[in-house]
Swiss-Prot record:
Pfam families, per the entry: Amino_oxidase (PF01593)
Organism this protein belongs to: Synechococcus elongatus (strain ATCC 33912 / PCC 7942 / FACHB-805)
SUPFAM superfamilies the record matches: FAD/NAD(P)-binding domain (SSF51905)
Organism placement in taxonomy: Bacteria, Bacillati, Cyanobacteriota, Cyanophyceae, Synechococcales
Similarity-based family: Belongs to the zeta carotene desaturase family.
Pathway: Carotenoid biosynthesis; lycopene biosynthesis
The protein's Enzyme Commission number: 1.3.5.6
Entry protein name: Probable zeta-carotene desaturase
Record-level Gene Ontology MF annotations: 9,9'-di-cis-zeta-carotene desaturase activity
Entry's Gene Ontology BP terms: carotenoid biosynthetic process
Essential cofactor(s): decylplastoquinone; 6-decylubiquinone
Amino acid sequence: MRVAIVGAGLAGLAAAIDLVDAGHQVAIYDSRPFVGGKVGSWIDADGNHIEMGLHVFFFNYANLFALMRKVGAFENLLPKAHTHTFINKGGEVGELDFRFPIGAPFNGLKAFFTTSQLTWLDKLQNALALGTSPLVRGILDYEGAMKIIRALDRISFADWFRSHGGSEGSLKRMWNPIAYALGFIDTENISARCMLTVFQMFAAKTEASKLNLLAGSPAEYLHKPILDYIQARGATLHLRRRVREIEYTETNGQTVVTGLQIADGDAVERVEADVYLAACDVPGIQRLLPEAWRKWSEFDNIYKLDAVPVATVQLRFDGWVTELGDREKRHQLDHATGLDNLLYTADADFSCFTDLALSSPKDYYRKGQGSLLQCVLTPGDPFIAMKNEDIAQHVLKQVHELFPSSRDLNMTWSNVVKLAQSLYREAPGMDPFRPDQKTPIANFFLAGSYTQQDYIDSMEGATISGRRAAKAMLEAQAIAA
C-alpha cells in the first residue's frame, strides 16, 4: 500500500512508524524546511539551536515513550527531580514535591498539603475540590472516571473548581500557570475536561507527573532517530513541499482522493498514493481541505476549532540566572549550576521556563557562557505584533523580578519565535468538534493532536492521533483485501 502523509510533525511520524512496520510504502511531505511541526527545531546562521517551543516529556507519555524506545531515542531523555517548582517574585520558591515513599495518589496528596505555594486555607479548599472530583473514583475505576470527565468539557476548569469549593488563590497561584503550560490559556478559558484528564493520569500512576527534558535539541535527539528508523525501512521525506490541492473524484456518491498537487520550487508535482493522511495542525488542515468537503459535518466542524498564539523567547546570559544562593557559583563559567527542572511562575507573562544550558546541555550548554533561558509567553496575543527586541527586553525585566540576583548578569543574546496559531484552543464545548481519524472518504484520514484522543494538544496527543490513524488505515486495507 502506498501512503502519502502530509505533515512531518509527531503525528505524521508516529503514523509512518506503524505503517513501515507493517511493510507499506510511505512518503512524507512538509512545507517547512525541517521536521517536527510544533516540536521542530533548527540551527541558525550562528550555530544556535532554535526551538518552536519548550518541550517537556512527562512519564505518562506512554505512547511517545514506546515510540522513542522503538527508534532508540528513549535514552536521550534526562529525568528531573519529581517536583513541580514555582518561582515567585523576589526569588521565592514554591514546590509541589511528589517525592514520597508511598505512591499515587498519596504522593500527590503529600505534594499539595506540603506546598508553600498556597496558604493553608487555599490548600483546604483545593483538597475539597479535588476530593469531590472524579479523580477519587478514578483510583478504582479509571474508565468510569474518564466518562464523567469527558462530560465536563462544556464548562471551564475555573467554573468547575469554584463549584467544588476551590479558591481564587489556588487558581491564581497554582492552576493558572499549569493551565498556561498545558494549553496556553488560563483556567477561565480551558475546558475542565482538559485539566481533569491530566490530573486523572497523574493520580493514577506514581511516576506520571514526573518529567524529563531532552538531552539536547528535538532535531537531533528526537527526530533524527525517528527519521533514521523509517528511512531505513523505505520511507521517503520531502521538505519545502506545500500541498496546493487535493484531487478527488465522486462516483455514485462515493468520494475518492486520486492525488495531490504539491509545489516543488516553482513547479508543481502530482503525487499519487493508495491512501492519504493529513497530519496537520488546525490552521494547516483548514487550509488544506477542499471547500466542497464541508458538506460533511466531520470536516465542517474543524472550522469551528481555533488555535492560540504563543511566543517562545531564548535569553543567553554571562552567568547562571537560577543559581539563587551563591554569588560565586552564579558568576563562574566552568560548569552549569542552578535549578535543573521545568519552572512555573504566576508572576510573569511566561508561565513556564527552564535553563536549557542546565536541563538540556548537549546542544545548549556552551563553554564559557551561562544560562540559556527558554520562556514561553502565554497568552501570546499581546506579543505577536511587538518587535522581537522589545519582547526580549520585556522578558528580561520579568526575569530580574523573579531572580533579583540576576540583575548583575548581562544578557548576551536573545531570540524570539512567534506562532500566531499554535495549539488548538481547548475551550469549553469544543471537544465535540474534534474529528475522528477516519473520515467519510474511504482513502483519506486525519491525524494531529486536535483530532479525537483523550490527551491534550501535546506530543503525546499527537503520537496517539498518528497511531490511531495508522490503525484505521491498516484496518481499512484489511477489509478491502
